[in-house]
């Protein structure tokens, strides 16, 4: 499809340098047109994980085994992370903070009295090379330097004691360990990140930009910090660090405290690697071939000249190739250069239904909206009567805890599962809880990628109730159903998303260097509020 017809037929529009670029069309990555422009990345695949999350092994909720089971259900790799130390813990003379000190130091003591050995043993138990990878890691808090997580290559890595984050980094030299700062936007001196302590290189190849705490891309925009640790400010953010000239990858993880790694919407890391092996994933992490996503597994193929994400390239002329495949309608795609929008590609306000009878679409089905506090157990199947299901992507959430609070009681993690899936149906076993407020979701969901005729039906058969809609109906808009009646749990068939609204491929050139070293990164926003960011590339 040529540029004029693509814009006319799909509702996309382009601003900045993108307006003068070469639109390759709405298509799968690696089209014939793209291959003429840029090298293929067909030998690499995006793998998804969570490298920072918590359960009741220290302070948090949910059993550790359930945490690994939950991770297996929707991730490729994980590190379930105990809290290990806080060398500069404050408040020794402040009665107001006594419970905080006791709570933390008690957990550190339990970890050293057998908890760490139990954790390492279970991490080894769940590690399956080529299927599901696990990593040993642990967290250290710091008022001065900000909180960090150590991620180890070795599955028998010891717990290393330290007197500060800088001492920790010194002791880790020569070992295969990444030390990664997180929730970076808090105030300096109060567990926000101190960029004066950043050391570029293999020990800290990436930083955690997004989690349940919020988004530290800048001091503006979506996902402000709302935790009682304080507001988000400028000096700890990613853009502040980039403006200092630092080079690092950007990633996300949940920092979840209810034993549900990968909890949908709380943060995930994507790693571009040739295989799901420890060596391949570790090397991709080391070389900054990483991306960040809030929840949806949005694929971003962004290259400058022949370089991939996280790389450093040289040259005044930069050939930019971009291919994005979302899980829902794309709101916009930004190419950011030196903190400013170089180009923006706007997706359609309303997806345009494709011509023809048989179409490829993505249909998300949500389950939840409980009236009562008790969990609703969803058991049943989603199916199609015509065409086929190409893939089933889980969007499973854990309980909405960012951190434990005084007086909270323990609870059992309810692990959601895709029991089976084939081209005609998928069997699901899920638990939804009441949305804790009108801005925090607790529903469970899956995304069906389908190829089927418009008169084919998408059918939900759960808990003795059956609802169905044709794909043609869902292309017109979403449909919802209460299970019992008003003020009861509900099912939502979201609007069917045609390929033209969640996929775009683009090529352009930037011939204007601005600095000795320019940095670029890509960010993608979907209309449902899901985000993804591709690690920056630097050009000298």
Where do the language-model regions lie?
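Extended, charged catalytic domains and RNA/DNA-binding interfaces, predominantly
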Residues: 12-14, 27, 33-540
């Amino acid at each position: 499809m040529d540029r004029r017809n693509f814009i006319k037929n799909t509702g996309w529009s382009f601003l900045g340098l993108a307006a003068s670029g070469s639109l390759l069309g709405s298509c799968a990555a690696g089209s014939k047109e793209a291959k003429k422009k840029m090298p293929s990345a067909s030998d690499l695949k995006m793998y998804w994980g969570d490298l920072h999350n918590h359960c009741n092994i220290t302070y948090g909720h949910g059993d550790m085994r359930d945490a690994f089971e939950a991770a297996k259900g929707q991730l490729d790799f994980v590190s379930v992370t105990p809290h290990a130390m806080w060398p500069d813990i404050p408040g020794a003379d402040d009665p107001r903070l006594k419970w905080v000190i006791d709570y933390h130091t008690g957990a550190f003591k339990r970890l050293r009295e057998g908890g760490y050995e139990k954790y390492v043993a279970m991490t080894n138990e769940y590690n399956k090379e080529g299927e599901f990878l696990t990593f040993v890691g642990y967290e250290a808090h710091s008022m001065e330097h900000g909180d960090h997580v150590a991620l180890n290559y070795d599955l028998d890595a010891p717990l290393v004691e330290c007197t500060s984050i800088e001492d920790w980094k010194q002791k880790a030299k020569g070992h295969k360990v990444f030390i990664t700062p997180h929730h970076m936007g808090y105030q300096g001196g109060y567990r926000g990140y101190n960029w004066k302590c950043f050391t570029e290189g293999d020990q800290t190849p990436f930083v955690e930009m997004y989690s349940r705490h919020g988004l530290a891309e800048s001091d503006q925009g979506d996902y402000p910090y709302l935790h009682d640790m304080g507001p988000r400010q400028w000096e700890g953010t990613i853009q502040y660090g980039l403006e200092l000239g630092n080079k690092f990858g950007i990633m996300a993880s949940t920092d979840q405290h209810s034993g549900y790694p990968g909890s949908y919407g709380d943060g995930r890391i994507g790693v571009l690697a040739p295989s799901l092996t420890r060596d391949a994933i570790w090397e991709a992490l080391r070389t900054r071939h990483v991306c960040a996503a809030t929840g949806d597994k949005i694929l971003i193929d962004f290259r400058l000249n022949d370089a991939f994400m996280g790389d450093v390239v040289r040259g005044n002329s930069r050939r930019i190739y971009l291919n994005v495949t979302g899980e829902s309608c794309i709101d916009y795609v930004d190419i950011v250069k030196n903190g400013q929008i170089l180009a923006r590609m706007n997706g359609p306000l309303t997806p345009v239904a494709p011509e023809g009878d048989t179409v490829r679409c993505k249909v998300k089905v949500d389950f939840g909206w409980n009236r009562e506090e008790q969990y609703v157990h969803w058991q049943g199947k989603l199916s199609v009567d015509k065409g086929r299901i190409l893939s089933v992507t889980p969007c499973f959430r854990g309980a909405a805890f960012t951190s434990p609070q005084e007086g909270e009681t323990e609870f059992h993690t309810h692990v959601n599962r895709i029991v089976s899936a084939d081209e005609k149906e998928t069997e699901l076993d899920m638990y939804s809880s009441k949305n804790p407020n009108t801005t925090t979701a607790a529903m469970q969901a899956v995304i069906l990628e389908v190829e089927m005729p418009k008169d084919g039906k998408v059918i939900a058969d759960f808990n003795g109730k059956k609802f169905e809609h044709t794909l043609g109906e869902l292309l017109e808009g979403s449909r919802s159903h209460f299970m019992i009646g008003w003020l009861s749990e509900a099912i939502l068939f979201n609007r069917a998303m045609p390929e033209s609204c969640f996929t775009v491929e683009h090529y352009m050139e930037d011939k204007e260097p601005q600095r000795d070293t320019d940095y670029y990164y890509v960010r993608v926003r979907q209309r449902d509020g899901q985000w993804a960011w591709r690690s920056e590339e630097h050009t000298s």
